[in-house]
Amino acid sequence: MPMYKHLQQDASRPPVTLATLQRMKADGEKIACLTCYDASFAMLLDAADVDVVLVGDTLGMVIQGHDTTVPVSMDHMVYHSAAVVRGLSRAFLIGDMPFMSYPTKELALTNAVRLMQEGGAQMVKLESGGKQTEIVEFLAGHDIAVCAHLGLKPQSVHKTGGFRVQGREREAAARLLDESQRLEAAGADIVLLECVPSELGKAITKALHVPVIGIGAGPDVDGQILVLYDMLDITSGRKPRFVRNFMEDAHDNLEALKGYVRAVKQREYPAPEHCF
């Protein structure tokens, strides 16, 4: 029996679905999301009532020790997604499409299907915008749920010059707003915004009908997500401005996770000091 099996939610409890997330946006209920990479932590996230779990390619940095997410492969993502899904009974599971796993429509479809069939993901996430909009439309046309990632895109850090806030200038903000609307029209079911000014996060959330999840995107998006190891203060070194250490006032991991969910739901996180 897995170490935390006794903490897992009652399987009879209704699972979170895409329809649940759409209703939460309509009702103004904040969506609490976290990354996860293994079954034991997945059970803890479920016990803490985390709504959405993302098996992120951030595993390349926090699990594998790389400086970027670029080295992560499709095999890595399938392996970790399959591990996470075994620990979940309630949360909605999104799987990340790693670097160069979707350069063409056909390869994107092959890898998305693999992430769902072998990895158990209910939705796939792509770093989007520009030519990727056509890929989002192609996947959506094959009944695959898609999360479109805009703003700071970690897979592109070598091209963009590092990890920095996006959309500060008026033209850049207008371009991101336009891209978000194009992605929604193409069939994206969720938009994830990373490292953008709070006002831009608010504007995009207001403009879209689909849920908008933010990481460093201000308090007015529909939901928040953090890297699990950051908010539990497991990672060492300097952390991004938007990270809050939820272990600081907790006795154990589960208490910290519940504190995060509560802070998101009650609109206590992110605070002004976490925003751009």
Where are these regions (language model features)?
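Alpha/beta enzyme core
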Residues: 2-276
